[in-house]
């Protein structure tokens, strides 16, 4: 009799478990939805910390809200950059990329801030990542060609400029850059004139220099 009771009890628990799990999932989904709405409202009011806190909690309950959280990080980063808080902006773009590493736009936005800080190497790396994700985006090649030019890398700047013109043959900025780069290439290819032979004569200034008393 005792064994029969135990069996019935275990069987009853097994039947209840899916129902309990489903009830918890429904509760979590409702809570996540509420938190996401709170986050969206806070974001609308530019209450960034509150928005991020709400969306972090929503994402912990339901991962589908992760993209919303990434978007708020982007918004806060943009606001920080607008206020010249560039390091804060870079930090928030980094958080957004942890959530959405396939979003080329975030790499582009962070690169723009890095250029404000004159950190061309990091900006170059971010534009390169953006290009991997969107290889036909003219804007990314245009910005990267500019960075290469600033760094004095004429060869790679020309390669990116040619890519821009292949995708957008009438791009005026690229046409101007190509002409400028061609001029630089020709100047580099022209050998420097020989240095004048050293004169053995004393310069006029030296000839009339005052003697020590």
Label every PLM stretch briefly.
Residues 68-75, 109, 143, 177:
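Canonical tetratricopeptide repeat
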Residues 36, 43, 74-77, 81, ...:
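Position-specific recognition of the canonical hydrophobic site in helix A of tetratricopeptide repeat
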Residues 44-45, 82-83, 116-117, 150, ...:
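Register position in tetratricopeptide repeats
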Residues 32, 66-70, 104-105, 138-139, ...:
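Helix-start (N-cap) detector for alpha-helical repeat units in TPR-like alpha-solenoids
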Residues 57-60, 64, 94-98, 129-132, ...:
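Conserved structural position within tetratricopeptide repeats
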């Amino acid at each position: 009799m005792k064994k029969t009771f135990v069996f019935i009890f275990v069987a009853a628990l097994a039947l209840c478990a899916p129902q309990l799990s489903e009830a918890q999932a429904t509760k979590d989904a409702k809570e996540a939805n509420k938190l996401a709405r709170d986050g969206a409202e806070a974001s609308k009011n530019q209450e960034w910390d509150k928005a991020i806190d709400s969306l972090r909690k929503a994402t912990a309950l339901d991962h589908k809200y992760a993209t919303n959280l990434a978007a708020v990080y982007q918004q806060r980063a943009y606001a920080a950059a607008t206020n010249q808080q560039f390091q804060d902006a870079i930090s928030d773009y980094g958080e957004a990329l942890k959530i959405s590493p396939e979003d080329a736009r975030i790499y582009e936005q962070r690169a723009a801030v890095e250029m404000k800080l004159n950190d061309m190497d990091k900006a170059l790396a971010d534009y390169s990542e953006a290009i991997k994700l969107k290889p036909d985006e003219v804007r990314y090649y245009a910005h990267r060609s500019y960075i290469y030019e600033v760094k004095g890398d004429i060869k790679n700047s020309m390669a990116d400029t040619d890519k821009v013109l292949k995708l957008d043959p009438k791009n005026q900025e690229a046409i101007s850059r190509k002409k400028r780069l061609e001029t630089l290439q020709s100047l580099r290819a022209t050998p420097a004139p020989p240095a004048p032979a050293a004169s053995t004569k004393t310069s006029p200034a030296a000839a009339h220099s005052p003697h020590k008393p």
